[in-house]
UniProtKB/Swiss-Prot annotation:
Superkingdom of the organism of origin: Eukaryota
The name this protein goes by in its record: Iron transport multicopper oxidase fetC
GO terms, biological process: cellular response to iron ion starvation; reductive iron assimilation
Molecular function GO labels: copper ion binding; ferroxidase activity
Binding locations of Cu cation 1: 80, 415
Gene this chain is encoded by: fetC
Lineage summary: Eukaryota, Fungi, Dikarya, Ascomycota, Pezizomycotina
PROSITE patterns reported for this sequence: MULTICOPPER_OXIDASE1, MULTICOPPER_OXIDASE2
Family from the record: Belongs to the multicopper oxidase family.
A GO CC term attached to the entry: high-affinity iron permease complex
Length: 622
C-alpha cells in the first residue's frame, strides 16, 4: 500500500512537471505618484510606471522568471518572495546583505526559481526598510489539488496594509534618533484594503468564495471581520489546515490567511467588512487617525452601503488551535536549541535598538551566503559570519527548536525564511520566560501542530517553534515589524553550509550588481579573505552605554539639579508675591483711614509707626 501511495505521488509530480509553465515578468522599478487614502499624494515605488504593483500568479510547479531593473535613481533595491522556501535556490531569496547584494540604481538582476509550494504568499523589497514605500504585492500559487476545490466557486484576493504619508528614508532618521530614546515607532497615517479605501467587492448570492488575505503592511497587525458572514479558515501562510470557523481573525504584518466565505441566498442588502489596525502596537494615538478601513460585499449596486456596526470587543480566532491538513505530527525532541530573548535598549549614541539577547543585527560587508561559498571548510564556524549577524550554524536534517522570550512590552510577529515551523507553544501575555514557566515540564504539545512561517508573540510572553533543517541555505529569523528589522531584531541561520558549497553557484548578473555597488563577494563578514577569523573592520553597532556616570553625565546632572532648584524657587516666589502685595495694600488703606478719621488733629505718628511695624510683620510672615 505504501508503495502504491509513493508511486501515485511520483506520477502526480511528473504530470505537474510536464504541464509546468514559465512565467516571465520584466519589472522596471520606478518612482510614481499615488494618493491611496485620498488625503496625501506622495512618491511611491511602482513597477513599469504603475502602482499598486502587479499580483504574481502561477500554478504549482511553474517556473517564475523576473527580470528586475532598478530605475529608482536614488535607492538600491531587492525582491524577497515571502514564504517560498527557495529549496535549491537560496540565492533567489532576496534579502540584501544576506543572500545577495542590493541592486544599485541602473543595475539589473534576474530572479529565476521553481515554485513547489501551493498557497498564498507575497513579494516585497528586502532592502533598507524600503517596502512600506509601495514595493510589495500578492503572490498566489494555484493548486489543482486544493483540498477544498470542489466547494469553491470563485476566488478573491485582499491585501491589508498600513500607510505612511512620509517616505521611509525620511522616517528612519527620526526613528533611529537620540530624540526618540524610547524607540517609539512611527504611527501610520492610514489603513488600506487593496491599497485603497471604501472598497466594494462584487459577490453573487449562494456562492462560496476562496478569500486570500495578506497583510502587506510594515507595522500594524489587523483585525478583520465580515458582518453577517462566517469565515472557514483553510490555509495559513501556505499551509492547508483542517477547516475552522471564525467570526473575526487577527493577521500580523506578513501573515496570510485563506478562508471560505459563503454568501447569503438573497440580494436584499450589502454588507460591510472591516479591517482595524491594532492600536496596542502604537505608542501614540493620534486624534485624527482613523484606525479602520471599511469595505463592502456588494450584492446589489443599486442598494445602499451601510456603515459598519460597532463591536463590543475585539476577540479574534486563536490560530494556535489550527491543525495542519496533512496531519504532520510533532517533530521529535530537538538536536539543537536556540534561545532568543527580545530586548529593546539604548546604546552609546542614545538611540534605542532591538536585540536578540545582547546582539543587535548589523549587515556584514560580504553577503552571508557569499561568505559560505568562499570560505571552504571554515564555513561551519559561525565566527566567520561576524557576531553582529547573530549566526547559528545548523547541521543538515537536525531538528531545531527556537524558544523566543519576549522581554518587551510590545507584540512581535516573527518570520523564518526558508521554512515553515511547527508552532508548538505560545504563552499568554505577561507569562514571563519559557524557563520561568518551567520549560516543557507540565505542558502538552499538540500532536499535529499548526505550521506557518510567521507567528505573533505576546508582550512579556514566550513561544516555542520547531523545524527540520532540510533546506541548505542562509535564512533569516526576524521580527516582521519593519521598524524592528531596521533597529536590529534579526538572527541568521546558516544551514548545511558544506552542502551549499557543492550545489550552488551565483549567477553573473548578481555578481555584477555587487561590483556596481562596490560590495565584496568573498571573505568573512569583514571582507577578509586571508584570515577568515580576523573580523577587524566588520560593521558594528555603536558602543554600549558606559557604566555609571561619565564626566559629561555628571556635569549634566549638576546643571539639571541647579535648574530644578531655581525653578522651584521661582514658583514659590511667584506664589507668595500676590498675597504680600494684597496685605501691604490693606495696611496702607488702614493707615489712610486712621489719618482721616483720627480726632481731627494731625496724623498720629505713633499709630503710623505701629501700622508700619504691622506691615513689617506681615512682610516677614509671608
Amino acid at each position: 500500500m505504501a508503495r502504491l501511495v509513493h508511486l501515485t505521488a511520483v506520477l502526480a509530480a511528473s504530470i505537474r512537471l510536464a504541464a509546468a509553465a514559465t512565467i516571465n515578468h520584466d519589472f522596471n522599478v520606478t518612482w510614481v505618484r499615488a494618493n491611496p487614502d485620498g488625503a496625501f499624494e506622495r512618491p511611491v515605488i511602482g513597477i513599469n510606471g504603475k502602482w499598486p504593483i502587479p499580483t504574481i500568479e502561477c500554478n504549482l510547479g511553474d517556473r517564475i522568471v523576473i527580470n528586475l531593473n532598478n530605475q529608482l535613481g536614488n535607492q538600491s533595491t531587492s525582491l524577497h518572495f515571502h514564504g517560498l522556501f527557495q529549496n535549491g535556490t537560496n540565492h533567489m531569496d532576496g534579502p540584501s546583505g544576506v543572500t545577495q547584494c542590493a541592486v544599485p540604481p541602473g543595475s539589473s538582476v534576474t530572479y529565476n526559481f521553481t515554485v513547489d509550494q501551493p498557497g498564498t504568499y507575497w513579494y516585497h523589497s528586502h532592502n533598507d526598510g524600503q517596502y512600506p514605500d509601495g514595493l510589495r504585492g500578492p503572490l498566489v500559487v494555484h493548486d489543482p489539488e486544493f483540498p477544498y476545490k470542489k466547494e469553491v466557486d470563485e476566488e478573491i484576493v485582499l491585501t491589508l496594509s498600513d500607510w505612511y504619508h512620509d517616505e521611509i528614508q525620511t522616517l528612519i532618521p527620526q526613528f533611529l534618533s537620540k530624540t526618540n530614546p524610547t524607540g517609539a515607532e512611527p504611527v501610520p497615517n492610514a489603513c488600506l484594503i487593496n491599497d485603497t479605501q471604501n472598497i466594494t467587492v462584487s459577490v453573487q448570492p449562494g456562492k462560496t468564495y476562496h478569500v486570500r488575505v495578506i497583510n502587506i503592511g510594515a507595522f500594524a497587525g489587523q483585525y478583520l471581520w465580515f458582518e453577517g458572514h462566517k469565515m472557514r479558515i483553510v490555509e495559513v501562510d501556505g499551509v492547508y489546515t483542517k477547516d475552522a470557523e471564525a467570526d473575526m481573525i487577527y493577521i500580523t504584518a506578513a501573515q496570510r490567511v485563506s478562508f471560505l466565505l459563503t454568501t447569503r441566498n438573497d440580494t436584499n442588502a450589502n454588507f460591510p467588512f472591516m479591517a482595524s489596525m491594532d492600536k496596542a502596537l502604537f505608542d501614540k494615538l493620534p486624534a485624527d487617525l482613523n484606525y479602520n478601513s471599511t469595505g463592502w460585499l456588494s450584492y446589489d449596486k443599486s442598494k445602499s452601503y451601510p456603515d459598519p456596526a460597532l463591536v463590543d470587543e475585539l476577540n479574534p480566532f486563536d490560530d494556535m488551535t489550527l491543525e495542519a491538513y496533512d496531519g504532520m505530527e510533532l517533530l521529535p525532541e530537538p538536536d539543537q536549541n536556540v534561545a532568543l530573548d527580545v530586548i529593546m535598549k539604548n546604546l552609546g549614541d542614545g538611540v534605542n535598538y532591538a536585540f536578540f539577547g545582547n546582539i543587535t543585527y548589523k549587515s556584514p560587508k560580504v553577503p552571508t551566503l557569499y561568505s559560505v561559498l568562499s570560505s571552504g571548510d571554515k564555513a561551519t564556524d559561525p565566527a566567520i559570519y561576524g557576531e553582529h549577524t547573530h549566526p547559528f550554524v545548523l547541521k543538515k536534517n537536525e531538528i531545531v527548536q527556537i524558544v523566543v522570550n519576549n522581554l518587551d512590552e510590545g507584540r512581535h510577529p516573527f518570520h523564518l525564511h526558508g521554512h515553515n515551523f511547527q508552532a508548538i507553544y505560545r504563552s499568554n501575555e505577561s507569562a514571563g520566560t519559557w524557563e520561568d514557566g518551567g520549560g516543557a515540564a507540565g505542558k502538552t504539545f499538540p500532536k499535529v501542530p499548526m505550521r506557518r512561517d510567521t507567528l505573533l508573540i505576546y508582550p512579556n510572553g514566550n513561544m516555542v517553534l520547531r523545524f527540520k533543517a532540510n533546506n541548505p541555505g542562509v535564512w533569516l529569523f526576524h521580527c516582521h515589524i519593519e521598524w524592528h528589522v531596521i533597529s536590529g531584531l534579526v538572527a541568521t541561520f546558516v544551514e548545511a553550509p558544506m552542502d551549499l558549497q557543492k550545489s550552488l553557484a551565483i549567477p553573473t548578473d548578481h555578481l555584477d550588481a555587487c561590483k556596481a555597488g562596490n560590495i565584496p563577494t568573498e571573505g568573512n563578514a569583514a571582507g577578509n579573505t586571508k584570515d577568515l577569523l580576523d573580523l577587524s573592520g566588520q560593521n558594528t553597532p555603536p558602543d554600549p552605554l558606559p557604566a555609571g556616570f561619565t564626566t559629561r553625565g555628571i556635569v549634566a546632572l549638576v546643571f539639571s539639579c541647579v535648574t530644578g532648584i531655581l525653578g522651584i524657587c521661582v514658583v514659590a516666589w511667584y506664589g507668595m508675591s500676590q498675597p504680600l502685595e494684597e496685605a501691604t495694600a490693606a495696611v496702607a488703606t488702614l493707615v489712610r483711614e486712621a489719618q482721616v478719621t483720627g480726632s481731627g488733629t494731625s496724623p498720629n505718628h505713633d499709630d503710623g509707626n505701629a501700622a508700619a511695624t504691622e506691615a513689617g510683620v506681615l512682610r516677614r510672615r509671608t
